[in-house]
Amino acid sequence: MRRLLILTLAALFLVLAACAPKPYEPAGEPTGNAALDDAVLSLLQERCSAKNSEQENLRAVYDFIAHDITYRPGTADMSGGFSDELTEQLALELLHKRKGNCDAQAALMAVLLRRMGYEAQLVQGTFVREEGAEPVDHAWVYALVGGEGVYFDPLYGGSFAERAEDYCMAPAALLKKTHQWDENALR
């Protein structure tokens, strides 16, 4: 009787273990920056699910930056563009402080997308907040998703509620209404 109970419990344990949700395993490579890689993996496993579609996981990451990160005005020295080192530094700082400018938000978005297995590139350009206004320097992300080039701009997707647009997997045509950039510079 005791042996039957043990076998039954063991079988039940195996069934439960097989049914347990599997953690999200990103397809991309880590950056090599241990602190950043640990924080990114933790965030992805918290926000994404192996059961979700690709679009649902991309939306979850975008929404995290758009809604859980506070905008802090400021500029980084972008004279040399977004080097890997600067991108990683901005992303890690943003994860720790939970506030940052468009450069930091774009850097984190790119790092997360790359870790998820997508080709992602930071874009520098300008943004016009309202018709007739002067353009301001701005940064966002271009990525290949399902073979299609799309854009992510979490800053104007959440932090500026009066101006909120859905720039998650946005086509170029949508961004061209307010964003300006050199499309020839994109890979």
Q: Which positions does each model-derived feature cover?
A:
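Bacterial signal peptide processing site
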Residues: 20-22
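C-terminal motif of bacterial Sec signal peptides marking the signal peptidase cleavage site
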Residues: 15-18
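Secondary-structure boundary elements
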Residues: 30-96
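Hydrophobic/aromatic-rich core segments of domains that either
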Residues: 63, 104-173
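Positively charged n-region of N-terminal signal peptides that target proteins for export
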Residues: 1-4
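Low-complexity, Gly/Ser/Thr/Pro-rich intrinsically disordered linker/tail segments
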Residues: 165-187
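Repetitive helical segments and hydrophobic/amphipathic motifs
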Residues: 11-12
